[in-house]
Amino acid sequence: MPDFRLAFRPFREQMAFFERKVNVPSTRWDDIRLGDHAHGFMVAGAIRAALLDDFRNAVLRAQREGRGLAEFTREFESIVAKHGWTGWTGEGSAKGRAWRAKVIYQTNIRQSYNAGRYAQLTRPAMLAVRPWWEYRHGERGYSRNPRPIHQSWHG
């Protein structure tokens, strides 16, 4: 797996996007619909404010300091133990816990990176010199299971 610390170095627009998000307690991943995910920070099943704050701060530190998944996973385990968080998908096994930490880490870092890049690419000065985009899917090898629709947009 690629080392995301090399690919996702934080930049101003990325951090601004993540820092604007507000904590949103949720019981399931689909409690929040469509574009609302862009404005709220949520972890499915995390309904207590202190738990959500700790997860958010862990993601924020991971972005600011370039922490990798292994470091984030250790912090995830510590947060879960500290709050006695139970009843979440993946809880019952080491593989499940690793999966859940990875989902939280990668989703938030990728989303903020993409939103930050979009902010950069849609500046009027940038659009004046690059008025169109070309979709290139998976050239860096991050997507091991690409969606057919994404592959169809390539090029």
Q: Residue spans of the language-model regions?
A:
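Domain-core detector
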Residues: 1-155
